[in-house]
Amino acid sequence: MFRAQQNAFDDAVAKATDENLTSENWEYILDVCDKVAAEESGAKDAVAAMIKRLAHRNANVQLYTLELANALAQNCGPKIHRELASRSFTDALLRLANDRMFANNPDFGIMEQAYMKLKTQNPNLQPPSKPGKREITEADRQKEEEELQMALALSIREKPSAAPEPKAEPSTSVSEPASQTQTATSQAVPPGTSAATVSRVRALFDFQPSEPGELQFRKGDIIAVLESVYKDWWKGSLRGQTGIFPLNYVEKLPDPTVEELQREAQMEAEVFGQIKNVEKLLTLLSTRSSELNVQDNEEITSLYHSTLSIRPKLIELIGKYSQKKDEFTQLNEKFIKARRDYESLLEASMAHPAQPQYGRPGQAPYGYPGPAAPLGYPQGPPQSDPQRYFSPRPQDQTHMYPPTSHSPDPRGRTPPAGPSFPQHQQPPPDSYQPVHHRPESTYDNPQELGTSVYDSPVEHPSSSQRLPYPPSGAQVPPGVHQQFQHQQQEYPPSGYPPEDASKPPAAGFALQPPQQTLQQPPYPTAPGAHQPTPSHQPPPVPSTASKPTPYPSLTPGTPSGGEYQAYNPSQAGAANSNPNSYYR
């Protein structure tokens, strides 16, 4: 009987916000704006028509209605502003959007109140600001460690208590903590929570990294927590990527309880139990003729309804196992990369084995201590007169092997003629002495300082005397020993004066290399005069009188007036016919 008056703007607003439009039709929108501006009650009627369109279930209709309201607010002046700021229109916008152009106008306070109401009731509409990156203090790390130890102790305490419980009532002690955990962790991660007690978090908002090292994620992603990095930032892993993320963008996920695991297992069993019904339904549908009425067949209908109930569970399981598949794929890729790195390092180490530092392992190079150097060295007899023997300073003994004495064999043994080559002989372990000891000759008794360039030999205590080892690197030209043996039959030993100590002993003798000279401390004939030690046999004991020299001098470079004269012993020494008295 009482029929509501039809709104004149319903058709125009419906035409401008038609759901079949692919985009905004500004021709229809401007027609509505012109009509509102032309009529006195046009603003009120247009807003009422838009409120109806906002209640439409089609999202395109809602978007076109909001665009129409925006166009009216910009083109129709204060009248339409008052209508748009009314409580009826703002209530319709509470779950859609808000118009920011009313924020600073106190006349339209209802719209501002609606905006604040949206912010307070729905805080998750906009993501929060990122917290600052503050370093974790030592107290925070200690607290995190304490929480971890406490959680481990609680888990160990709960396992023995849960074992003797009967299966009939397993949820009495587990359901209450699980419900409390779920209610406590439904919100964002609390400030006091540490990464040691949280294994997974769920993203509440989309996060776009602004700095390198931050983890990108979308709302709903499950992030695996690794460790705490900053005060309000944790490190996590998602889809093979590792980075840090803010805590106010995520919420803590509790570990699944026993009831949840049993529920998931039961759901999976139900889904897999319906596989045979699905296969049977497919078989019936494929074997029946097309003329068969499916609605009249009760078997097909019952099978269809029974299998239709597992569809949401099946979709959930597909998502669950798809995520597990991605996780296992990423784990496999990491394992393959780690195995390849290990194999490459192993091949590199096998291709380049460790080389010994000095020479062969069985023989140490000359001038370096061998592995058995400090063992088994003989010590010299006690010294009766330290002034009569040469004792080098400790700083001069920088080599492990002592200088080899080049005193000849008193029995007159001469090496065979021929070219001699430098060679390394392995001396017996007891023929050398350690560093910083007085050098000794190859004989057992100490040796006096000689009065000529040749060392004075000492008498052998026994016939089993060891022969000296030639030094490493010393070269003796062929024919030198024969030449000198021929000369020593005619000449007595001669010495160099102190002023000519720097001259070479003879042109026919091979000089020692610098290293060999340094490793053989000379025996000076006078203070301050250092003469190299020759490597040949000394001449025999001189006779009582000096004979003329029919042969040229050993130093042909010196003039005839400065030739070296033969040593003339004193008359007292000549009267002594015992040759051994000369060496005392």
UniProtKB/Swiss-Prot annotation:
Residues 121-145, 158-193, 354-584 are annotated as: Disordered. Residues 16-151 form the VHS domain. It is found in: Endosome membrane. Residues 143-162 form the UIM domain. GO terms for biological process: protein transport to vacuole involved in ubiquitin-dependent protein catabolic process via the multivesicular body sorting pathway. GO terms for molecular function: phosphatidylinositol binding; ubiquitin binding. Gene3D superfamilies: 1.20.5.1940, 1.25.40.90, SH3 Domains. Residues 172-188, 442-454, 567-584 have a biased composition (Polar residues). Residues 161-171, 354-378, 475-489, 510-534 have a biased composition (Low complexity). The keyword Transport applies. Residues 196-255 form the SH3 domain. It is a peripheral membrane protein. GO terms for cellular component: endosome membrane; ESCRT-0 complex. Keywords: Endosome, Membrane, Protein transport, SH3 domain, Transport. Residues 132-144 have a biased composition (Basic and acidic residues). Belongs to the STAM family. Component of the ESCRT-0 complex composed of HSE1 and VPS27. Component of the ESCRT-0 complex which is the sorting receptor for ubiquitinated cargo proteins at the multivesicular body (MVB). This is Class E vacuolar protein-sorting machinery protein hse1. It comes from Aspergillus fumigatus (strain ATCC MYA-4609 / CBS 101355 / FGSC A1100 / Af293) (Neosartorya fumigata).
